[in-house]
């Protein structure tokens, strides 16, 4: 029997205040308010397609720019994911997903290995998507990988930047959903720990 895989994490700095409440075995419910509409949209998509119950409340120095808020939300979400997974007994651990969205195609492969690493092939034409700098889309993925201690390979192609980013976050959601799925009772590593 699996215990509830849930975590609540808070991150407070001079730049941001972030609170994340994550339940891995959820139904896709979300309540997200980061002050950045596009980031909210992406996180709601992660919750919906990852079947995660997710609450995010963030206040950041948006008068400076979006960087600190995007980064700290990703760091806090990653910490919550890592904590909620515990010792990772029984999880599938590795997964991938490919998501089309009109002209865009995104692929994400990840490993909840305990070893953070990212390989990204993301190109956006516009400097800003909604209210988020396009360079911070990749930075979100990198920050999430570091704090969740997971390996993420992600690529996206297409013409419309909104479609590319949204396909990326949906692929991330589906890969997480598959990787956290419980398949057996053992820790999925020849080392005996992750």
Curated annotation (Swiss-Prot):
Its EC number is 4.2.1.19. GO terms for cellular component: cytoplasm. Pfam families: IGPD. One of its GO terms (molecular function) is imidazoleglycerol-phosphate dehydratase activity. It comes from the Archaea. Keywords: Amino-acid biosynthesis, Cytoplasm, Histidine biosynthesis, Lyase. The keyword Lyase applies. InterPro entries: IGPD_sf, ImidazoleglycerolP_deHydtase, ImidazoleglycerP_deHydtase_CS, Ribosomal_Su5_D2-typ_SF. Gene3D superfamilies: Imidazole glycerol phosphate dehydratase, domain 1. It catalyses: D-erythro-1-(imidazol-4-yl)glycerol 3-phosphate = 3-(imidazol-4-yl)-2-oxopropyl phosphate + H2O. Belongs to the imidazoleglycerol-phosphate dehydratase family. HAMAP family: HisB. This is Imidazoleglycerol-phosphate dehydratase. It comes from Methanothermobacter thermautotrophicus (strain ATCC 29096 / DSM 1053 / JCM 10044 / NBRC 100330 / Delta H). The gene is hisB.
């Amino acid at each position: 029997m699996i215990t509830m895989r849930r975590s609540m994490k808070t991150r407070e700095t001079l730049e941001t205040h972030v609170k994340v409440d994550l339940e891995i075995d959820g139904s896709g419910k979300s309540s997200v308010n980061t002050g950045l509409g596009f980031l909210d949209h992406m996180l709601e998509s992660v919750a919906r397609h990852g079947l995660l119950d997710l609450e995010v409340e963030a206040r950041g120095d948006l008068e400076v720019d979006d960087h600190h808020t995007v980064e700290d939300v990703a760091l806090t979400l990653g910490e919550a994911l890592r904590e909620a997974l515990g010792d990772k007994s029984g999880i599938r651990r590795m997964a991938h997903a490919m998501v089309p969205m009109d002209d865009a195609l995104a692929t994400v492969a990840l490993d909840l290995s305990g070893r953070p690493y990212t390989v990204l092939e993301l190109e956006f034409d516009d400097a800003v998507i909604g209210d988020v700098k396009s360079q911070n889309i990749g930075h979100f993925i990198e920050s999430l990988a570091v704090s969740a201690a997971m390996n993420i390979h992600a690529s996206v192609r297409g013409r419309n930047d909104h479609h590319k980013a949204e396909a990326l976050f949906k692929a991330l959601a589906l890969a997480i959903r598959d990787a956290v799925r419980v398949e057996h009772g053992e820790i999925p590593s020849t080392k005996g720990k992750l």
